Amino acid sequence: MDDNKSKALTAAVGQIEKQFGKGAIMRLGDNQAMDIEAISTGSLTIDIALGIGGLPCGRVVEIYGPESSGKTTLTLQVIAEAQKNGKTCAFVDAEHALDPVYAEKLGVNIDELLVSQPDTGEQALEICDMLVRSGAVDVVIVDSVAALTPKAEIEGDMGDSHVGLQARLMSQALRKLTANIKRSNTLCIFINQIRMKIGVMFGNPETTTGGNALKFYSSVRLDIRRIGAVKEGDEVVGNETRVKVVKNKVAPPFKQAEFMIRYGEGISKEAELIDLGVKQKLVDKAGAWYSYKGDRIGQGKANVMKYLKEHPETANEIETKIRQELLLSKTVKAEEALPQGEDDVLPE
C-alpha cells in the first residue's frame, strides 16, 4: 500500500475508534480471541463430531428433532458440564416442562441453575437478551422456539389467524441478540421442534418452527433422532440416538455421532468409551471379551460398562487418549476452520 493510502487508512481507523470506541475496527490477525472456547456436550462422540470438543461459546446453536429424541436431555448435559467448570447457566423454560428431579439425576446443580418460565415469547426473548447483556451468564438455553408464543396470539381468541408472527419475533430477537452474544462470549442454545410442510411431493417435508432466521444466525445446527431402543431382557432401558451436525461454521460440517441415552441417567459415557476405544484400538476386543493394556476388563459390553463406572481412573485415562487422538486440541484456530455458507444444507 502506498504512503498516501496508508495515512488515509490510519486516519480513518483513528476516527472510527475515537467515535465508536477502541476495538470497533481491527485487523483480523490482531484479534486476541482467535481460539474458540468450547463447552463439552457431555457426549464424547458429539464433541468429536463438532470438531472443537464441544459447542462454541459466543455463538448461537440450534438443536432440533422429533418428540422424545433427547433434545432437552442433551442441553441439560451441556449445563452439567458447564457447571463443572464453574460457569453460570440459565434455562428459559417456555414449555413449562422442566423436571428438576431429572435434571439433578443428569448432574445439574439445580441450586445454581437460573430458571425462568415466561408467559409470552416477547418476555422470554427479552429475559434471554438481558441475561446475555449482563455478561455474567455463560450458557443460556431456550426450550423451545415452538413454545415462544407471541403476545398478540395469547391475547387473541382461539382460532384467530396470526400468520408469520412467530417468525417476525424470532427474526427481530436474533438481530438484537447476536452482537450481544458475541460480545459477552455466551453460548446460546435454542431447542426447536419439527413440523411438516404440506404438499411436498419430493425432498424432505420436515421443517423447523419460527421461520428461517434461526437457521442463518446459528453457527451450529444439530439434528437429533432416536434410532432404536436399548433393552435389558424384555425391558426397554434407553434409546439409541443419532446426532447429525447439519451446519457447522467453526469446523467441517456433516459429521454424525451415535450414542446411548439411558432413562434416568442421560448419555452413557461408558458405552461411548468402549465403542471409541475399540475403534481407536485402545481397547482390545476378542469375541465377547474386552481388554485394556493386556488386562481383561469384562465379558460383554454391559460388564465392561459396569467396570468403567467402578474404575473412573481407567475411564478418564481412555477418554484422555481418545481426545488426544481425535481432537488435536479442545479449541480450533479460526484460520483452520472450514468456511461454510450460511444457507448450506445437508444434501439429500
From Swiss-Prot:
Transmembrane segments: none annotated. GO terms for molecular function: ATP binding; ATP hydrolysis activity; ATP-dependent DNA damage sensor activity; damaged DNA binding; single-stranded DNA binding. PANTHER family: MITOCHONDRIAL DNA REPAIR PROTEIN RECA HOMOLOG-RELATED (PTHR45900:SF1), RECA (PTHR45900). GO terms for cellular component: cytosol. Can catalyze the hydrolysis of ATP in the presence of single-stranded DNA, the ATP-dependent uptake of single-stranded DNA by duplex DNA, and the ATP-dependent hybridization of homologous single-stranded DNAs. It interacts with LexA causing its activation and leading to its autocatalytic cleavage. The gene is recA. It is found in: Cytoplasm. Keywords: ATP-binding, Cytoplasm, DNA damage, DNA recombination, DNA repair, DNA-binding, Nucleotide-binding, SOS response. Belongs to the RecA family. SUPFAM superfamilies: P-loop containing nucleoside triphosphate hydrolases, RecA protein, C-terminal domain. This is Protein RecA. GO terms for biological process: DNA recombination; DNA repair; SOS response. ATP binds at residues 65-72. It comes from the Bacteria.
